[in-house]
C-alpha cells in the first residue's frame, strides 16, 4: 500500500488478510520447500518430518523477537527502523545501505535457482528471464489496489493448491535417516522458507490493529507454512518442483515492497535524497536500476555467490545486528540470548556439517569465494561512502 504523509501520520491501509498474505508469500509453501526437497532427495537418509520441525523450531525465537519489535515500535522500515532507534546515525546509515543492497543482490541468485530447476543454465537466458520480471513486479507494487489483490490471491492460491496436492498424493512413509543429513535438510528449509519472516515489520506503520494483525501475520502464517510444508513434503515431488516459480514470483513483490519502504524511510532520515520520500517513479526507477546492475554482475559477468552464503549474509544483516538493537530497546536478555544461540547453532552446523557433505556443498555452499569476500567488504564500504557524502558534502544527516 502506498505510504502517505498526513498531519496525523501514516495512513493505516493494511488489513489482517494483507498482513497474513504478505508474510506467507515471503516464506512460500509449495516453492519455498521445493529446493530443500530437491537437495534432500539427493543427499538421501533425510527424515523430512524431523527436518521441517527442527527448521521451524530454530526460527521461533526470531519470530517472537520480531513480533515484540513490531508491536512495540510500529514503524515503517523494519530492521532499519529498529537500528535507527537504537544506534547512531553513522551506524544506521551504513546498516541501511548494506541491508538494502543485500535485498538487491539476492534476487538474481534466487531467480537462478528457479531457472536451474528447468535446466536453464545459459547465463544470457537467465539474465533475460530474470530481467523481464523486474518491470512487471514494479508495476504491481506501484498500485496499492493491484498489490493488495495480487498478494491476497497468490496466498490463497498457494494454500488451496498445497492442500489439494496433499489430499491427492499424500503418502507418508517412515524414512531411515542420519542425524547429520536431517540437520542439513533443516537448514535448507530455514534458508528457503522459515527465515523469511520479517516482511510485515517493514510496513508496520501502515497496519490496522497492529497487535491482532501482527499475531496473525507472524504466528498463524508461520504455522500454516510449517504444517502444509510437512504434508506436501510427502506428496508428489514432481508437482512441487514444477510449481517452484510461484514462490519466486510471490517473493519478488514482497522483496520489492520491502525495498521501497526501506528507501523511503532512509529518505525521510536524509540518508537518501528527498525525492525518494514518496512511492513514485523515482523510487521504482532506483529499484529497477540497482536490480539490473545486480543482474548484470551476477548473470552476465559471473560475479555471484552461492545460495547458502547469500542466506548467511541475509541472516547477518537482518537478524544478528537487529538482535543487538532488540536488546538495547527492550532489555530482554533472555530472548536475545536464545536468538543468538539459535543462529550460532545454525551457522556452526552449516559449515561443520555442510563442508563434509558433498551434495550439500555442491548445491548450497560452492561458489565464487573471491566475490563472496568482496561482497562482504563492499556493502558497508558503500554505506560509509553514502554517509560521508550526505554528511560532509551535503551536511544533512544528524550527528
UniProtKB/Swiss-Prot annotation:
It is a multi-pass membrane protein. Keywords: Amino-acid transport, Host membrane, Membrane, Transmembrane, Transmembrane helix, Transport. The chain crosses the membrane at residues 19-39, 46-66, 91-111, 123-143, 146-166, 183-203, 225-247, 283-303, 307-327, 335-355, 369-389. This is Uncharacterized protein 399. Gene3D superfamilies: Amino acid/polyamine transporter I. PANTHER family: AMINO ACID TRANSPORTER-RELATED, MEMBRANE PROTEIN. Its main location: host cell. The keyword Transmembrane applies. Putative amino acid transporter. InterPro entries: APC_superfamily. It comes from Sulfolobus islandicus rod-shaped virus 1 (SIRV-1). The keyword Transport applies. It comes from the Viruses.
